[in-house]
Amino acid sequence: MKLKDTLNLGKTEFPMRAGLPTKEPVWQKEWEDAKLYQRRQELNQGKPHFTLHDGPPYANGNIHVGHAMNKISKDIIVRSKSMSGFYAPFIPGWDTHGLPIEQVLSKQGVKRKEMDLVEYLKLCREYALSQVDKQREDFKRLGVSGDWENPYVTLTPDYEAAQIRVFGEMANKGYIYRGAKPVYWSWSSESALAEAEIEYHDLVSTSLYYANKVKDGKGVLDTDTYIVVWTTTPFTITASRGLTVGADIDYVLVQPAGEARKFVVAAELLTSLSEKFGWADVQVLETYRGQELNHIVTEHPWDTAVEELVILGDHVTTDSGTGIVHTAPGFGEDDYNVGIANNLEVAVTVDERGIMMKNAGPEFEGQFYEKVVPTVIEKLGNLLLAQEEISHSYPFDWRTKKPIIWRAVPQWFASVSKFRQEILDEIEKVKFHSEWGKVRLYNMIRDRGDWVISRQRAWGVPLPIFYAEDGTAIMVAETIEHVAQLFEEYGSSIWWERDAKDLLPEGFTHPGSPNGEFKKETDIMDVWFDSGSSWNGVVVNRPELTYPADLYLEGSDQYRGWFNSSLITSVANHGVAPYKQILSQGFALDGKGEKMSKSLGNTIAPSDVEKQFGAEILRLWVTSVDSSNDVRISMDILSQVSETYRKIRNTLRFLIANTSDFNPAQDTVAYDELRSVDKYMTIRFNQLVKTIRDAYADFEFLTIYKALVNFINVDLSAFYLDFAKDVVYIEGAKSLERRQMQTVFYDILVKITKLLTPILPHTAEEIWSYLEFETEDFVQLSELPEVQTFANQEEILDTWAAFMDFRGQAQKALEEARNAKVIGKSLEAHLTVYPNEVVKTLLEAVNSNVAQLLIVSELTIAEGPAPEAALSFEDVAFTVERATGEVCDRCRRIDPTTAERSYQAVICDHCASIVEENFAEAVAEGFEEK
């Protein structure tokens, strides 16, 4: 036997290298085969409910890192709730209707207008479901636990029926109406868009300054006067029917030198405009308040059949332009509102494809709206005072990335204005984890217009509206519920397969259809109405969920998207918000803080991370960032996270190895019988348990990450485990001192594995497989550790906090000695301590082998003053010299008792007593040479 064989060196087959990319799929299959998700739900039946409702990602393409961050975050929350005494099922979902799928089919050569609509919709459905399958596998590969066999999908008959019923309740309450208000219009999609489908980009536009000649000055202005107007949308002059001024803005009547004409502009802008127009020696003839100009009539710049009325509007400012804006009620919300109030014509001169129509005039007809600037300039003639190119933030179609226009077309609207205050009151009851999120959603609802819910597309849920022979729209409870039942049985494609009369209840009559003839609506619903109905289609209709949901968790862009649409439909139907809490996340940016895009080549696919590092590293990364704001991710950043993971793994591997001979049922030492340092570590770990449990409850992942890493690096690695080897390796295998420390090791190992499970389920299960005395098959079926209370815990913490300060001072003394070549390693040191009464009392209270804690071979507590050469602090001083004696071959301490024993071992007296007591046969035979 060799002397080293008398050491209790930790033994384990738990691998140092994780091999996550290959092992994770194996574990995931094992969980699936064991029906782990279902078993967890069965285990928690009857416990308080917690419903995190999954916002549905769009089913198109593989998931990106933003999807991964979101779904991992949800998984961490649901897992932690399941392990904290809650029944917390998770139903993943997908959003499956809308233009992107139509665009994919178009790129594949499918020509929608050349084939049967029902066949086309079947292709859309097949493609959408194929993408659901693809993304389902992507999410499962991340280790996300959920009811993957029974997700919700917005194209299923039950969901579509639930959506129709949401619409029906809103219709019954009078919230659905038809109007021709201007809406965001995408010529590239040939459809109206909701606010949530708009994104803003910089756009360079031609802006024009031109003048309208006064036709009837109402006794205020002469007919040789011109009112100066500014526009950034020259094509809308074709539909201009008025000029809007600010009632309280000051305007001046001016005449530049050498100019026969007189002009009206905002007084505040005169200087800048004079420079822009090349006006010199400008004479101010008169000043007016805007309200004095009200109802003056001007000529249209070129259309002699049109007069333009000067009207008042609150939206006019002097921030730019001339303080006067031309008003085309068919091409803008403000224009429409002031136009209707003043009985202006709502002219629309652009068709659904962005092409100028006949009513724009023969010179414009057939031109694309963006290309008409030269024609407009030609038509303006000498009325044009200046033109310039400006760059401004402009709305774009979020899917096609093309600019959009405002355009008045007949659409179906949900009236938000009718119950806006109810919605705002409900927002006040919701808990927001970011206060700015509450402000953002509140302001959006407060300021938003009515919601245009109709779309002129094919792939979506039809609006369940019929038309009588006289054109009356029919949307009554009887017809809508009948449609819902048909959708529930056959799916929404039935709408296109049957005639209107076959979609109505048997025997249905309407006074507007004396001949019994009806037509059906051909528009579909906005996809935000689809996903915005999920609280009904899923949370209400699934018996395992509770409404309102406890939590909605999505990206911050959903304040104007899913959070918004869900809130409107839920309050409209039931008067309550669909969620009790909202947690929002920022966007995933690249390592430099730039937005990720395929064109820049800076995207990171979750599948690439899984191949290189494993999903576990992506999961740990999610906890390492403050996801309430935008976060950065790159392979370099993930490498750093991987290093942290390695540190966590190897620390836990040490605990596994050094409890391999520990049977908790037989070897556990009662808390009261632990050494002071072991009690301290137990209490410190208990603090970590509380911190992590509280952070899980508050969804504070970064707090968990920081607390965990700090405990492992500072409390364990840099302190407790640093001197632990002197105990667990050296002392007798069954000695009290070793069992005391193993008791703490095992307690930490089991509980920290549970604490890690929501974040690192693969690693936690791997560790669990090595804990033979734990009864649950899987750690995922266990509970998070409870927070404990220990006698005198505050006193113990205070004592050891003071000792840590003392230890830090001692380490400085040892470092100085190392630098002065007095010692090499700390075990070569004889440390002499010169304490005052405070430190002396502290060392007595610690009641431990202080030399062992400081990892020095010899320690002396001296009386009297310290020598001048000592390193002094306020309460203590230190001197360091080389320890006397020889190095013990077994414990490596320098000890004056070290000597060669009769059994061929050069060891100290302490090691000799251990060896002689525990290895009598080897002592009798003598040890082999090293």
Curated annotation (Swiss-Prot):
Binding site for ATP: 598
Disulfide bridges in this chain: none
Pfam families, per database record: Anticodon_1 (PF08264), tRNA-synt_1 (PF00133), zf-FPG_IleRS (PF06827)
Top-rank EC class of the record's enzyme: ligase
Alphabetical GO biological process terms: isoleucyl-tRNA aminoacylation
Catalytic activity line of the entry: tRNA(Ile) + L-isoleucine + ATP = L-isoleucyl-tRNA(Ile) + AMP + diphosphate
PROSITE patterns found in the cross-reference section: AA_TRNA_LIGASE_I
Annotated binding of L-isoleucyl-5'-AMP, by residue: 554
InterPro entries: aa-tRNA-synth_I_CS, aa-tRNA-synth_Ia, Anticodon_Ile_BEm, Ile-tRNA-ligase, Ile-tRNA-ligase_type1, Ile-tRNA_ligase, M/V/L/I-tRNA-synth_anticd-bd, Rossmann-like_a/b/a_fold
Record's keyword terms, sorted: Aminoacyl-tRNA synthetase, ATP-binding, Cytoplasm, Ligase, Metal-binding, Nucleotide-binding, Protein biosynthesis, Zinc
Cofactor dependence: Zn(2+)
Motif ('HIGH' region): 57-67
E.C. number: 6.1.1.5
Chain positions recorded as Zn(2+) binding sites: 888, 891, 908, 911
Keyword Disulfide bond: no
Cell location: Cytoplasm
NCBIfam families: ileS (TIGR00392)
Listed PANTHER family: ISOLEUCINE--TRNA LIGASE, MITOCHONDRIAL, SOLEUCYL-TRNA SYNTHETASE
Family: Belongs to the class-I aminoacyl-tRNA synthetase family. IleS type 1 subfamily.
Protein name: Isoleucine--tRNA ligase
Gene: ileS
